[in-house]
């Protein structure tokens, strides 16, 4: 059971601020909209309407379908069935040009803030207006007085106007969150979608963020997904709850009771959902990991884009086996497997070490991507030009970086080290820098599939360049891998698309 609102008693709990007066007319309309990934239904057919100016909390435990629903609402994901209308436009009938214009009217606030750490608060805020400016332009100090005045105004509105010229990596976590909210506010959106902004923060900070969201986006349509309703209750008009991909309840915030929350979060009894059946059957003998825990390591691409679904499938198939998952670069993961600190690793590059065995798990390709706002030479560009473009790189131990450097060197077009404008220690930071227009980047296609579909980045065509990429499982040859490691690898093969 989650923590329950202290304000709640046996009857209804407190409602929204009196200042919130939703305007008539729908901002969002779903009619039987659902989403499936193969045989698994992430979101069952849902019919829902949210009025313009309404503030809605989207509640539910992890895996309930909240993020999938938000992706339908921000148009980055199409429904498998039913229809979605956003700000009066049927998404399925909207062409690419109008879809870009529609997305410009939608602001998002993420749990991962997607800020560029080496840039100032002002540069991050201005670069947030995707399709209208770029971080390269702001870094060149080409921000007009009018833009600078407006940035200061939105930073004042979130309480950090005095930090306008401070680098983001020198700000506190709370101040960075305010920069992210100011960036969205600067876009002047009609609809704001916030995905778990209260996750991983202490109760006092969660209350501050909830109040700030309500104040900063007053009068606009606001949808906030969360599994913690307490900080939001005083600031929303309505609570929509999901459980196992289906609507659990939809009611005014003032009518929410402790019983509602208890039923939402209590353990499900009865038959299992066939749509969420295990990927593999448990064997007749229990799978035991050495030391009681199966230690898995992964580099960014498999760790962030493949392993989450594999770990869930493994937990369903082998509920008695504990799994720990750690993320690092390919070199560090490989070294940890070699040293026995990990039982199994998932990496993007091989090491010529006879003590290690590699097995091909998934195929991918490395592509060159850029923000739509970044001006480049006419395409397709030559290898020599690609090697000299302003570039955002991963850290030296990255498997992607190693593969790209070796591939281009073999083609006689070694990457120019002087072209590196930022070395990002995490994939999320690299994508944020590219989206803001700082430079191009070589990335796994799997890692940017959502960004490509959403129009946040585009691929850059390069003459004669094709870089195949593999995701490998790495194990030690001796001692023989445990039954748990082998079972995990079997689940991975069944779960990961080719």
Swiss-Prot record:
Q: Which Gene3D superfamilies match?
A: 3.40.190.290, P-loop containing nucleotide triphosphate hydrolases (3.40.50.300)
Looking at the record, which segments are called LysR substrate binding domain? 270-498
User: What keywords were assigned to this record?
Assistant: ATP-binding, Cell inner membrane, Cell membrane, Membrane, Nucleotide-binding, Phosphonate transport, Translocase, Transport
Annotated residues that bind ATP are located at 60-67
**Bilayer topology term:** Peripheral membrane protein
Give me the ranges of the annotated region Disordered.
1-27
Q: Which residues form a coiled coil?
A: none
Give the chief site where it resides.
membrane
Which terms in the Gene Ontology molecular function aspect does this entry carry?
Answer: ABC-type phosphonate transporter activity; ATP binding; ATP hydrolysis activity
Q: Where in the cell is it found?
A: Cell inner membrane
Domain ABC transporter spans what residues? 28-269
Q: Which PROSITE patterns match?
A: ABC_TRANSPORTER_1 (PS00211), ABC_TRANSPORTER_2 (PS50893), PHNC (PS51249)
Its GO CC terms are:
plasma membrane
Identify the domain of life. Answer: Bacteria
Pfam entry (one) = LysR_substrate
- Catalytic activity from the UniProt record: phosphonate(out) + ATP + H2O = phosphonate(in) + ADP + phosphate + H(+)
Entry EC no(s) = 7.3.2.2
The entry sums up its family as follows:
Belongs to the ABC transporter superfamily. Phosphonates importer (TC 3.A.1.9.1) family.
Q: How does it assemble?
A: The complex is composed of two ATP-binding proteins (PhnC), two transmembrane proteins (PhnE) and a solute-binding protein (PhnD).
Q: What function does this protein fulfil?
A: Part of the ABC transporter complex PhnCDE involved in phosphonates import. Responsible for energy coupling to the transport system.
PANTHER family according to UniProt: IMPORT ATP-BINDING PROTEIN, TRANSPORTER, PUTATIVE-RELATED
According to UniProt, the name of this protein is: Phosphonates import ATP-binding protein PhnC
- Per the UniProt record, the source organism is Anaeromyxobacter dehalogenans (strain 2CP-C)
Provide the taxonomic classification.
Bacteria, Pseudomonadati, Myxococcota, Myxococcia, Myxococcales
Q: Which gene name belongs to this protein?
A: phnC
């Amino acid at each position: 059971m989650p923590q329950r609102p202290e304000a709640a008693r046996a009857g209804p709990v407190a409602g929204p601020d009196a200042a919130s007066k939703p305007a008539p007319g729908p901002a969002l309309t779903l009619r039987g909209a659902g989403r499936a990934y193969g045989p698994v239904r992430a979101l069952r057919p849902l019919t829902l309407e949210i009025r313009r100016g309404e503030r809605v909390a989207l509640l539910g435990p992890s895996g309930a379908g909240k993020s999938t629903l938000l992706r339908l609402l921000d148009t980055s994901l199409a429904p498998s069935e039913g229809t979605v209308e956003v700000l009066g436009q049927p998404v399925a009938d909207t062409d690419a040009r109008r879809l870009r214009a529609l997305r410009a009217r939608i602001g998002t606030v993420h749990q991962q803030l997607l800020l560029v750490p080496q840039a100032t608060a002002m540069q991050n805020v201005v670069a947030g207006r995707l399709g209208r400016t770029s971080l390269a332009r702001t870094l060149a100090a080409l921000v007009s007085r009018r833009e600078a005045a407006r940035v200061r105004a939105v930073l004042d509105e979130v309480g950090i106007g005095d930090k306008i010229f401070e680098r983001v990596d020198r700000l506190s976590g709370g101040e960075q969150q305010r920069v992210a909210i100011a960036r969205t506010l600067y876009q002047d959106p009609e609809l704001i979608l916030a995905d778990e902004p209260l996750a991983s923060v202490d109760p006092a900070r969660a209350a501050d963020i909830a109040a700030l969201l309500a104040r900063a986006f007053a009068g606009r349509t606001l949808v906030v997904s969360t599994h913690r309703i307490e900080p939001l209750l005083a600031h929303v008009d309505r609570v929509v709850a999901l459980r196992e991909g289906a609507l659990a309840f939809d009611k005014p915030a003032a009518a929410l009771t402790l019983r509602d929350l208890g039923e939402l979060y209590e353990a499900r009894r009865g038959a299992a959902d066939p749509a969420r059946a295990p990927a593999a059957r448990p064997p007749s003998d229990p799978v035991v990991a050495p030391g009681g825990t199966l230690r898995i390591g992964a580099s960014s691409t498999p760790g962030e884009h493949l392993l989450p679904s594999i770990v869930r499938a493994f937990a369903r198939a082998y509920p008695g086996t504990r799994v720990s998952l750690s993320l690092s670069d390919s070199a560090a993961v490989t070294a940890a497997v070699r040293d026995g600190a990990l039982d199994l690793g998932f990496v993007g590059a091989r090491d010529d070490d006879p003590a290690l065995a590699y097995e091909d798990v998934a195929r991918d390709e490395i592509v060159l991507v850029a923000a739509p706002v970044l001006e480049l030479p006419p395409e397709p560009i030559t290898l020599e030009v690609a090697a000299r473009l302003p570039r955002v790189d991963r850290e030296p131990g990255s498997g992607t970086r190693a593969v790209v450097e070796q591939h281009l060197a073999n083609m006689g077009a070694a990457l120019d080290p002087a072209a590196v404008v930022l070395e990002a220690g995490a994939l999320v930071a690299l994508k944020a820098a590219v989206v803001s227009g700082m430079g191009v980047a070589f990335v796994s296609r799997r890692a940017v599939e959502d960004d490509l579909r959403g129009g946040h980045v585009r691929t850059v065509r390069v003459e004669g360049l094709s870089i195949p990429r593999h995701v490998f499982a790495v194990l030690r040859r001796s001692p023989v891998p445990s039954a748990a490691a082998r079972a995990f690898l079997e689940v991975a093969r069944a779960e990961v698309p080719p």
